C-alpha cells in the first residue's frame, strides 16, 4: 500500500529541485536517504524531510508490517511549479526590471516492493458448481 507526502510552497525554484529529485526517483528509501544526506544542495534537506514524512505515513497505514521487513522505494516524485513572488529592481533611466522568485510543490509517493497477498475468493469451485448442473434437453416433441 502506498503512502503520499506533499511539500507545498517550497522557496526553491522547480528547476533546481528537479535536479535532486531525479537522483532519487525509483530508488529504495534507505539508499535515497544516503543520497540526500551527501548531496550539498539546499533542496536535499527539504526532500529528506519529505521522505521521512512519507515513510512515517506508510508506517502508520501499515502497522501490521514491520518497517525493517518492508522494502520501501520511491514510486513517484513530482515537482510542480507554484506561485511566484514578484519584485521590482530599479534599473537605469527610470526603468525597472522584474524579479520573479519561484516556488514549487513536491509530491512524493512511497510504496513497498514486496506485494503482500490478500486472500482471493476461490473461483474454481464456483466454476465447477456451474458445470455440474444437470440440464434437461428436449427436442420440442411430446413423447
UniProtKB/Swiss-Prot annotation:
Entry's Gene Ontology molecular function annotations: rRNA binding; structural constituent of ribosome
Gene3D superfamilies registered for this protein in UniProt: Ribosomal protein L22/L17
Lineage: superkingdom: Bacteria
Gene Ontology biological process terms in this record: translation
Listed transmembrane segments: none
Matches recorded under CDD domains: Ribosomal_L22 (cd00336)
Keyword list, A-Z: Ribonucleoprotein, Ribosomal protein, RNA-binding, rRNA-binding
InterPro entries membership: Ribosomal_uL22 (IPR001063), Ribosomal_uL22_bac/chlpt-type (IPR005727), Ribosomal_uL22_bac/org-type (IPR047867), Ribosomal_uL22_sf (IPR036394)
Region Disordered, annotated ranges: 124-143
HAMAP family: Ribosomal_uL22_B
UniProt record similarity statement: Belongs to the universal ribosomal protein uL22 family.
Quaternary structure and partners: Part of the 50S ribosomal subunit.
Protein purpose: This protein binds specifically to 23S rRNA; its binding is stimulated by other ribosomal proteins, e.g. L4, L17, and L20. It is important during the early stages of 50S assembly. It makes multiple contacts with different domains of the 23S rRNA in the assembled 50S subunit and ribosome. The globular domain of the protein is located near the polypeptide exit tunnel on the outside of the subunit, while an extended beta-hairpin is found that lines the wall of the exit tunnel in the center of the 70S ribosome.
NCBIfam families named among the record's database cross-references: rplV_bact
Protein name per its UniProtKB record: Large ribosomal subunit protein uL22
Upper lineage: Bacteria, Pseudomonadati, Bacteroidota, Cytophagia, Cytophagales
Amino acid at each position: 500500500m502506498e503512502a503520499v507526502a506533499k511539500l507545498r510552497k517550497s522557496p526553491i525554484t522547480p528547476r533546481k529541485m528537479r535536479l535532486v529529485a531525479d537522483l532519487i526517483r525509483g530508488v529504495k528509501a534507505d539508499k535515497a536517504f544516503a543520497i540526500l544526506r551527501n548531496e550539498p544542495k539546499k533542496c536535499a534537506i527539504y526532500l529528506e524531510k519529505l521522505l521521512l514524512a512519507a515513510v512515517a505515513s506508510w508506517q502508520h497505514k501499515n502497522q501490521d508490517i514491520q518497517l525493517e521487513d518492508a522494502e520501501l522505494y520511491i514510486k513517484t516524485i513530482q515537482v510542480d511549479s507554484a506561485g511566484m513572488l514578484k519584485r521590482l529592481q530599479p534599473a537605469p533611466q527610470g526603468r525597472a526590471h522584474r524579479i520573479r522568485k519561484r516556488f514549487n510543490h513536491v509530491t512524493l509517493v512511497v510504496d513497498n516492493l514486496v506485494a503482500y497477498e490478500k486472500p482471493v475468493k476461490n473461483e474454481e469451485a464456483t466454476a465447477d458448481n456451474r458445470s455440474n448442473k444437470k440440464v434437461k434437453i428436449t427436442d420440442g416433441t411430446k413423447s
